[in-house]
C-alpha cells in the first residue's frame, strides 16, 4: 500500500484497467451494475464480458450506476485502509451519471479529502488518468499537486474505437454525435472517439472492417508521432484474434510504451458496444 502520503486512487469499473495494473498500482475499483430481468451483477466482479456476449441472443441487459451503498462502502474501506485523501477517476459525465453519483456521495463523507475527476473519456483512456495519478503518488508528490497534474493529464488521453455494428450504441442511447444512419448497405465503419464534451463523435469514416482496423493503426501512429513517454492500450470486445493482428502491426509502439495494457473491455461497455469492438487507448 502506498501510504507514505495517505493518498488513494479509485476508478470506476469502466476505466477498464487490467487486474494486474490495479494490483501493481494499488487502485481501488468501483463497479457499475449489469441488470438482467432475473438478476443484477456487479461489473467485472460477478460477471465477465464473455458471459454478457454469450447471453446477447436471449437478452441484452440494462446497465446502471454504482449503487449508493457500494460507493459509501468503498470509501469506508479506503478510509479503513489508512487513506484520508482520494483521487477518483470517473468515466465521462457526457456518457454516464457515474461521476455525479460519486460526487454526491463524496460530499457527505467526513474526515476525507475526495476529488472526483471527470475524465471526459471512456474505457482505458479514463483508466490512464487513474494510472497517471498513481504514478504521481508513487513519486511522492503532495495531494494538491497530484490533483492538478492529473486534471491536466485528462486532455492528454484519447480513445479510438470501431464497432462491429452501431446497433448497440443506438439501442443504449449512447450514439452521441455518431450518425446512426451510417449505412450498413455501404458498409461504412466510423472510427469513434470522445469529443471535448466527453460525448462519442466520429473522427474518421472508412469502408469495411479491414479498412477500419488499418485506420485505427494509422491513427495510433499519427497520434503518438515522436512521443517517447506514452501509455498505450489495445482492447477488444469479443474480437480477440483481430486485436492480436493490431498488436502485431503496432509491436514497435507496444515495446516502447511506458505503460502497455491489453484485453477485453468491461461487461458494461460490452453491453453498449456489442461484439466486434476494437479500440486503442493513448496518453501522451
Segments (PLM) and residue ranges:
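Active-site-adjacent beta-strand anchor residues
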Residues: 11, 88, 236
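Mixed-charge interfacial surface used for oligomerization/domain docking
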Residues: 2-5, 14-28, 33, 39, ...
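Glycine-rich phosphate- or other oxyanion-binding loops that anchor nucleotides, phosphorylated ligands
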Residues: 58-59, 65-88, 92-101, 147, ...
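N-terminal glycine-rich anion-binding loop in soluble enzyme alpha/beta folds
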Residues: 7-70
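Generic beta-sheet signal
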Residues: 7, 84-88, 230-232
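A short glycine/small-residue-enriched secondary-structure motif
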Residues: 47-52, 81, 103-108
Amino acid at each position: 500500500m502506498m501510504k507514505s502520503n495517505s493518498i488513494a486512487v479509485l476508478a470506476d469499473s469502466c476505466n477498464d484497467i487490467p487486474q494486474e495494473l490495479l494490483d501493481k498500482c494499488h487502485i481501488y475499483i468501483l463497479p457499475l451494475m449489469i441488470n438482467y430481468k432475473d438478476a443484477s451483477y456487479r461489473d467485472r466482479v460477478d460477471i465477465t464480458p464473455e458471459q454478457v456476449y454469450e447471453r446477447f441472443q436471449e437478452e441484452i441487459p440494462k446497465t446502471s450506476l454504482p449503487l449508493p451503498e457500494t460507493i459509501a462502502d468503498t470509501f469506508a474501506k479506503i478510509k479503513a485502509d489508512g487513506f484520508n485523501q482520494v483521487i477518483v477517476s470517473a468515466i465521462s459525465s457526457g456518457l454516464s451519471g457515474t461521476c455525479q453519483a460519486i460526487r454526491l456521495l463524496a460530499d457527505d463523507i467526513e474526515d476525507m479529502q475526495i476529488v472526483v475527476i471527470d475524465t471526459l473519456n471512456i474505457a482505458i483512456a479514463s483508466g490512464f488518468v487513474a494510472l497517471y495519478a498513481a504514478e504521481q503518488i508513487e513519486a511522492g508528490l503532495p495531494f494538491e499537486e497530484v490533483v492538478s497534474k492529473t486534471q491536466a493529464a485528462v486532455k492528454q488521453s484519447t480513445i479510438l474505437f470501431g464497432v462491429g455494428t452501431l446497433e448497440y450504441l443506438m439501442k443504449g442511447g449512447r450514439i452521441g454525435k455518431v450518425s446512426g444512419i451510417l449505412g450498413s448497405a455501404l458498409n461504412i465503419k466510423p472510427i469513434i472517439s470522445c469529443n471535448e464534451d466527453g460525448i462519442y463523435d466520429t473522427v474518421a469514416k472508412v469502408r469495411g472492417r479491414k479498412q477500419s482496423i488499418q485506420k485505427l493503426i494509422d491513427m495510433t501512429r499519427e497520434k503518438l508521432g515522436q512521443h517517447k513517454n506514452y501509455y498505450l492500450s489495445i482492447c477488444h470486445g469479443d474480437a480477440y484474434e483481430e486485436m492480436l493482428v493490431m498488436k502485431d502491426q503496432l509491436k514497435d509502439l507496444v515495446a516502447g510504451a511506458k505503460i502497455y495494457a491489453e484485453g477485453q473491455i468491461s461487461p458494461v461497455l460490452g453491453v453498449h458496444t456489442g461484439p466486434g469492438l476494437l479500440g486503442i487507448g493513448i496518453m501522451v
